[in-house]
Amino acid sequence: MADFKLADRLATLPPYLFAGIDKVKAEVAARGVDIISLGIGDPDMPTPDFIIEAMKKAVERPANHQYPSYVGMLEFRQEVANWYGRRFGVSLDPKTEVIGLIGSKEGIAHFPLAFVNPGDLVLVCTPNYPVYHIATGFVGGEVQFIPLVEENDYLPDLDAIPAATWDRAKMIFVNYPNNPTAATAPRAFYEKLIGICRKHNVIIAHDTAYTEVYYDENDKPMSILEVEGAKDVTIEFHSLSKTYNMTGWRVGMAVGNASLVAGLGKVKENVDSGIFQAVQEASIVALRDGDDFCRELRGIYRKRRDVVVAALNKVGIACRVPTAAFYIWAKVPAGYGSSAEFVTAVLEKTGVVLTPGNGFGTPGEGYFRISLTVDTDRLEEAVSRIANL
């Protein structure tokens, strides 16, 4: 059988972070070790019944078995606009400022195709979800990483970026609530970022998939589009995955500047065929009727967060108490040469799957990420195993 050479854009890629973790996990599981997976951010709880029932009804309609719209059903886009208005006080035109996505990852990965030419500079805040820089690299863009450090609350130091860099930049990727650090961004940060990007004509691509996983009803994460002037330069990516335990359904949305939304739509009409309409109809029900479920879900994650933070503190592992997202970003204990070394040792010796901080970028070295995606008993067991390593 012929062995064909990969294209350069693939051959030079590092292994995808979670693919490597899955490989080691499989090897350990094959030895009969009980695995507790706190690696990938995939909710362990099912999609709620009211969404599943809506899906069952939608699947039975023959009209939903045909090709869907590339940009999403107008009814779905209208419900996204309604939800944004209710949740964030943001007004959106569903016809021009909203587009449906086959999960937000799909939209983020395709977005640089619409606006980044070979050699264009794209700023990526790091540690980061790897898709931002990988998608940029696929289209020949030049990536400049902007470090996020604990001393600055994991916000980029915008003043440290020279004016000449802003002049060159075509786009900046930001992500709050942040994966992997669980940091949130205050209004003042967004105001400053928008001011700079409007001045230098830089596109803001904001990934905000975790806004509905927060722990204080009086401190809800905001949309960047709440800030005056944001629509001039911003597209915001959101998802139903984490909000309603729908990671496998592959449904999300991008909203904001009409020309940015249209550009992404131009790419999508040439590379995919849209979201299965039955999924869109069920998603309409989720967005319209899901507030009570989201409140209950936050309560579960709050208990899990508190259990893990207390357990880590008890064994002397330092971590910040997150106010949003279902991740704990903790410091690697002394005695390990790298976060990858620590995570590998934990997995091989205890069966607990963690994510090494350096897998998200150089500033993540010295940290590891815990996903709160198992029940409290298993979380306590996981930390106990780590403590006894």
Curated annotation (Swiss-Prot):
Modified residues (N6-(pyridoxal phosphate)lysine): K242
Binding, pyridoxal 5'-phosphate: Y70, S104, K105, Y129, N179, Y210, S239, L240, S241, R250
EC number: 2.6.1.83
Top-level EC class as recorded in UniProt: transferase
Keyword Transferase: yes
Metabolic or biological pathway, per its Swiss-Prot or TrEMBL entry: Amino-acid biosynthesis; L-lysine biosynthesis via DAP pathway; LL-2,6-diaminopimelate from (S)-tetrahydrodipicolinate (aminotransferase route): step 1/1
Binding site for substrate: Y16, G41, K105, Y129, N179, R369
InterPro entries with a match to the protein in the record: Aminotransferase_I/II_large, DAP-NH2Trfase_DapL_Desulfo, DapL/ALD1, LL-DAP_aminotransferase, NHTrfase_class1_PyrdxlP-BS, PyrdxlP-dep_Trfase, PyrdxlP-dep_Trfase_major, PyrdxlP-dep_Trfase_small
Catalytic activity: (2S,6S)-2,6-diaminopimelate + 2-oxoglutarate = (S)-2,3,4,5-tetrahydrodipicolinate + L-glutamate + H2O + H(+)
Cofactors that this protein relies on: pyridoxal 5'-phosphate
SUPFAM superfamilies the UniProt entry points to: PLP-dependent transferases (SSF53383)
UniProt-recorded Gene Ontology molecular function terms: L,L-diaminopimelate aminotransferase activity; pyridoxal phosphate binding
Any single GO BP term: lysine biosynthetic process via diaminopimelate
Pfam families: Aminotran_1_2 (PF00155)
CDD domains named among the record's database cross-references: AAT_like
Keywords attached to this entry: Aminotransferase, Pyridoxal phosphate, Transferase
Intrachain S-S bonds: none
Family named by the database record: Belongs to the class-I pyridoxal-phosphate-dependent aminotransferase family. LL-diaminopimelate aminotransferase subfamily.
Function in brief: Involved in the synthesis of meso-diaminopimelate (m-DAP or DL-DAP), required for both lysine and peptidoglycan biosynthesis. Catalyzes the direct conversion of tetrahydrodipicolinate to LL-diaminopimelate.
Subunit structure: Homodimer.
Annotated protein name in UniProt: LL-diaminopimelate aminotransferase
